[in-house]
């Protein structure tokens, strides 16, 4: 699951990290973030 797929901004706020976090929560993880290579990293 890469962050560039859902990477867009609203009012200067990037939502790709939010999508990544939601993806990780759906997998039962504690959230996640997008790294410098636009890859979703779950906690």
From Swiss-Prot:
Record has Amino-acid biosynthesis as a keyword: no
**InterPro entries in the cross-refs:** Defensin_invertebrate/fungal, Scorpion_toxin-like_sf
The UniProt entry's GO CC annotations, sorted and at most eight, read: extracellular space
Q: Where in the cell is it found?
A: Secreted
Q: State whether keyword Transcription applies.
A: no
Query: Keywords assigned by UniProt?
Result: Antibiotic, Antimicrobial, Defensin, Disulfide bond, Immunity, Innate immunity, Secreted
Q: Where are the coiled-coil regions? A: none
Q: What does this protein do?
A: Involved in anti Gram-positive activity of immune hemolymph of Z.atratus.
State the similarity comment.
Belongs to the invertebrate defensin family. Type 1 subfamily.
Name of the protein: Defensin, isoforms B and C
Q: What is the lineage of its organism?
A: Eukaryota, Metazoa, Ecdysozoa, Arthropoda, Hexapoda
